[in-house]
Amino acid sequence: MAKGYTQKEGIDYDETFSPVAMLKSIRILLSIAAYYDYEIWQMDVKTAFLNGNLDEEIYMMQSEGFIAKNQEHMVCKLKRSIYGLNQASRSWNIRFDQVIKSFGFEQNLDEPCVYKRHQDKVVMFLVLYVDDILLIGNDVGVMSSIKVWLSSQFDMKDLGEANFILGIKLCRDRKNKMLGLSQAGYIDKVLERFSMQNSKKGLLPFRHGVPLSDDQRPKTQEEVNTMRQVPYASAVGSLMYAMLCTRPDICYSVGMVSRYQSNPGPKHWQAVKHILKYLWRTRDYMLIYRCEDLIPIGYTDSDFQSDLDFRKSTSGCVFTLGGGAITWRSVKQSCIVDSTMEAKYVAACEVAKEAVWLKKFLSNFGIVRIEQVPITLFCDNSGAVAQSKDPRNHKKGKYIERNYHIIRDIIARGDVVVAKIESANNLADPFTKALPQRTFESHLEGMGVRLVHNSL
């Protein structure tokens, strides 16, 4: 391994950025695979970073134990990239990009680690996540030839039909065209890591009537000493990975506890343990994609100044495709708003920009026909819906910052249409506030998060 920390920028390396596939892109492709009953295969590149070509002249000392006799004063000139170099991941990504394009694959312009090969009725998708390759397609013969060709270019490990992707278990019922994503094994490890495997099981990931704030930070030296022994940041990080992959149901709760990582108090830690207890009860929940209409639908919502520290609102959104959630978000707004309408208008603007990316990403595939059809974005506030369509100068909207009016341009060019929906049917509601159990679980059903018995 090279001592990359001794490299000098501008001399030994220049750019170091290397993209990886986004989790939402993987979920979208899995939803498409479930709808069309595509094959899902997996491969792994052995020692991937040794395949990159170097543009710079890099020298390194001879490795200990392999020093050439009578040439102890000599150094090695690298012909290829190796682990430890600052540019190693970038060199590998560039090499793979060149190789896969030479075999007829086209790169998705809006997701550089997703490739497509479409010829006649044969459809192939390839996803690259560092050294993990996901191959999705409808022709076993062509897919086999791709695997043979990749093996001729790199040292590959054929993992066959995909069962685990980045720690996510894939469960398929091909007869009913259903695909489930489960992190039960990961959740078990998290519970054991934080000694919660024998705790009581929680009904919800949040506690009603117990808002979090900066006032709950440690106030006495005893509390400070106690919290120093608590693995708060590690627990939040572990929860966040589950939330980002397959568990939109804990998105709001994880977002709330993550705001206090710099100096958490006992009540903040109790909130984290409450989420762990909920995951203990729902460890077998899956994110399910079914053979439903392959039309993306968006939902947006916001609360009003629920943040007790800065009086800012929380925006929430979720997009579904094929009966399951493909992307979701719960974030604190960057501005202070003056009304509920303004809060929901700001939230809708951010979601509309996500819809633009989603439409471009899907249009590039050529199998989801949405080029001429706008994505429907549901909002439960009539004022925000009206404000998004036409300029309205009234006392509740005249203070809205100009940059949020981009949603009108997005609507005008036909990328998005904003429609009114009842709050009870708004799937984005759980991303902005704590809900009663029955309402919360009905929204989970709409997002495809459920317990499946003997179906997958």
Task: Please name every model-derived segment.
Residues M1-D155:
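Metal/cofactor- and membrane transport-associated sequence elements
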Residues L29, D44, M60, G84, ...:
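Mobile genetic element proteins and their domesticated derivatives, centered on retroelements
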Residues R95-V130, L134, M143, Q153-A162, ...:
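Active-site palm subdomain of RNA-directed nucleic acid polymerases
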